[in-house]
UniProtKB/Swiss-Prot annotation:
Domain TGS: 403-464
Name of the protein in question: GTP pyrophosphokinase
Alphabetical list of SMART domains matching this protein: RelA_SpoT (SM00954)
Residues annotated as domain HD: 54-159
Gene: relA
NCBIfam families: PRK10872.1, spoT_relA
Disulfide bonds: none
GO terms for cellular component: plasma membrane
GO terms, biological process: guanosine tetraphosphate biosynthetic process; response to starvation
Span of domain ACT: 669-744
């Protein structure tokens, strides 16, 4: 017996909606919802050239999901999804007409498209966009598995649909499903979808082998089915004679599983045990072992082929007793023995758990948490399997899974955090007030310190007090209380709102303690930091440090660089030696000097580097500053730091111009200010990709007061002309208010 489910896409056939809805065998309320939704789908698809195809896809999805006993919301979402994907129906309109659950499911299926985009790319911005998409997809998957089941059904529809397409189209669809979706269906234990995905993929990837096995099965089908019928009758009589409540039935075999066993065990078709297969479905667990006793008493079994997956379930939860016996005429027969619940779970997987849970409130929050932990483990196992297939880039896999932590609230809600996140990061992710009032945390019921690094799947409970009381120590990166920029920004915001006098006192104490370490004074701090950090008074400097607006390490590093700089004599001596060496080489060499990016006072071949503070690029007016041990530091003419250096050490200033023979990239920072909206980052990165500009890094923050998003991109450009063009292109993107270059 071989399982076959054909494609149902037919042209020029009359579709009867009422008859179709009745064939789904749902209750009156669900049937009414399905019929009403389909009428709406007809309206939406009426103006579309491919409208009939979209309607067919929706019907196919529903028919597959009904066999999995999925709930009404899942069926409605499945009907609507092809129309949303096809552009007939916007998510905004969907939100207005249907419940939030329907919208959530449709968007979850959409986000799973991120899997199909996991193609190798050298573009860092493209990789970043993929990582962001996959994170959102994982959150949807962990939060509600139903979107995954819809996606699996949708892939089966696609495999059916491409049946008559060119060979390369079928092979591409088959490879994606074999590498990604079949392992996912397996991890979720949905055998009913797994076998169809595998058989279609095998049929398209290895058509000759598929036809050969199908032909061999067909040639002996009648004899084999007669044999199985007699065997089932004999075994059923034996079960009744022993008062065992069990149903004996022939078991369908799948061509892919037959081929895989032939490959794995190096067997010919005639040597396979499970071409002849029987299943015994018992009422209770004790009946399973009683049935096994009857089987082994009546027929001789092969000990090496016995497996007890009831006592030792497979990783995906599969349970069954497997045995192989010698039946009449000495022919081998594979027998599976399981309970009704085990059988349903092996066919429906996680969908079976939904079926049992629906309509009950048992288990509560802990049950929801346990379910999601188990579900998360399955997803992590699946991504390992998927990466083994070579389909997922190792770097992307690391960014998605190794650089993120998925933790849970006591109610089972999933929280996506960066790796090394702490309980305080978790608290501030939930809500600002939860973070401000946090005085402790429990992980898995145990008290943990604020420096504890959350692990994948941790259940976190935050302990709070009535009044908010954050500590300034939370802002110290060396202490490790807070690691996420989101949490740090919320702590900063709290301290900014507090009494200014307290911030001044605290900031002064912090600054004095750090100045001692670099042998500097408050007077040095006031002199060197005022202009650099745009503070007009010592009190403003202290208040900025105390509130967290000014990073103490940035202030100290800036002061240290100016207070403890090398003497002029030391730098002059090194420069003289360098110039002398360069002159000697030029005098003794008959080769033409190699031109560099920057020419110093007409002398080539000197060591220069571009200052990070102002990031000059070709086209900028520039000037050099003699440093200790690092040659000439090249600045923009209007650089604020260069202005300070002119004032304090004018003898080290040297004229420089751009050389003519250098071709390469220069790193500059571009700040983009824009209104917050979904898809903005993707449009910006696409714009930069179209301009063939490499993104070396990106940081972003939100100005909540102005409701604007501020993004700083580190770009690698060749010259000022390219920069001007890039800024113009960015400002043409919708909702971008300003794009400008930062000078330090």
């Amino acid at each position: 017996m071989v399982a076959v489910r054909g494609a149902h896409l037919k042209e020029n056939t009359t579709f009867e909606l009422v008859s179709w809805v009745e064939s789904l065998r749902q209750d009156a309320k669900v049937s009414s919802r399905i019929e009403g939704t389909y009428q709406r789908c007809i309206e939406l698809a009426a103006e579309q050239e491919n409208g009939p195809l979209l309607l067919w896809r929706g019907r196919e999805l529903v028919e597959i999901l009904v066999t999995l006993s999925m709930d009404a919301d899942t069926l409605i979402a499945a009907l609507l999804y092809p129309l949303v994907e096809g552009g007939c129906y916007s998510t905004d309109a969907l939100k207005e007409e249907y419940s939030g659950t329907i919208l959530h499911l449709v968007q979850g299926v959409e986000q799973m498209c991120a899997i199909s985009q996991l193609k190798s790319t050298a573009e860092e911005t493209a990789q970043a966009a993929q990582v962001d998409n996959i994170r959102r997809m994982l959150l949807s998957m962990v939060d509600d598995f139903r979107c995954v089941v819809i996606k699996l059904a949708e892939r089966i529809c696609n495999l059916r649909e491409v049946k008559d397409q060119p060979d390369e189209v079928r092979r591409a669809a088959a490879q994606e499903c074999a590498n990604i979706y079949a392992p996912l269906a397996n991890r979720l234990g949905i055998g009913q979808l797994k076998w169809e995905i595998e058989d279609y993929a095998f049929r398209y990837q290895h058509p000759d082998t598929y036809k050969q096995i199908a032909k061999q099965l067909s040639e002996r089908r009648i004899d084999r089915e007669d044999y199985i019928t007699h065997f089932v009758d004999d075994l059923s009589d034996a079960m009744k004679a022993s008062n065992i409540r069990a149903e004996v039935q022939g078991r369908p075999k799948h061509i892919y599983s037959i081929w895989r066993k032939m490959q794995k065990k190096s067997l010919e078709f005639d040597e396979l045990f499970d071409v002849r297969a029987v299943r015994i479905v018992a009422e209770e667990l004790q009946d399973c072992y009683a049935a096994l006793g009857v089987v082994h008493t009546k027929y001789r079994h092969l000990p090496k082929e016995f497996d007890d997956y009831v006592a030792n379930p497979k990783p995906n939860g599969y349970q069954s007793i497997h045995t192989v016996v010698l039946g009449p005429e000495g022919k081998t027969i594979e027998i599976q023995i399981r309970t009704k619940q085990m059988h349903e779970e092996s066919e429906l997987g996680v969908a079976a758990h939904w079926k049992y849970k629906e309509g009950t409130a048992s288990g509560g929050a802990q049950s929801a948490y346990d379910e999601k932990i188990n579900w998360l483990r399955k997803l992590l196992a699946w991504q390992e399997e998927m990466s083994d297939s070579g389909e997922m880039l190792d770097e992307l896999r690391s960014q998605v899974f190794d650089d993120r932590v998925y933790a849970f609230t006591p109610k089972g809600d999933v929280v996506d955090l960066p790796s090394n996140a702490t309980p305080l990061d978790f608290a501030y992710h939930i809500h600002s007030e939860v973070g401000h009032r946090c005085i402790g945390a429990k992980v898995e019921g145990r008290i943990v310190p604020f420096t504890y690094h959350l692990q994948m799947g941790d259940q976190v409970e935050i302990i709070t007090q009535k009044e908010p009381n954050p500590s300034r120590d939370w802002l110290n990166p060396n202490l490790g209380f807070v690691t996420s920029s989101r949490a740090r920004a919320k702590v900063h915001a709290w301290f900014r709102k507090q009494d200014r006098d307290k911030n001044i006192i605290a900031g002064k104490e912090i600054l004095e303690a750090e100045l001692v370490k670099i042998h500097a004074t408050l007077k040095d701090a006031q002199y060197y930091a005022a202009k650099r950090f745009n503070v007009k008074s010592p009190e403003e400097l202290y208040a900025g440090i105390g509130s967290g607006d000014l990073r103490i390490n940035q202030v100290i590093n800036h002061i240290n660089a100016l207070v403890n700089k090398p003497t002029a004599e030391e730098e002059d001596q090194q420069l003289l030696e360098k110039l002398s060496e360069a002159s000697n080489k030029q005098a003794t060499s008959h080769k033409k000097p190699q031109r560099d990016a920057v020419v110093v006072e007409g002398v080539d071949n000197l060591m220069t580097h571009l200052a990070r503070c102002c990031q000059p690029i070709p086209g900028d007016d520039i000037q050099g500053f003699v440093t200790q041990g690092r040659g000439i530091s090249v600045h923009r003419m209007d650089c604020e730091q260069l202005e300070e250096l002119r004032h304090h050490a004018p003898e080290r200033i040297i004229d420089t111009v751009w050389g003519g023979g250098f071709v390469g990239n220069y790193t500059i920072t571009v700040r983009v200010t824009a209104s917050e909206r979904n898809g903005l980052l993707k449009e910006l990165t696409n714009t930069l990709m179209n301009e063939k500009v490499k993104v070396a890094g990106m940081k972003s923050r939100v100005d909540y007061k102005k409701q604007m998003s501020i993004m700083d991109f580190e770009l690698e450009l060749t010259d000022l002309e390219v920069l001007g063009r890039v800024l113009k292109r960015i400002e043409q993107v919708k909702d971008v208010a300003e794009a400008k270059r930062l000078y330090g």
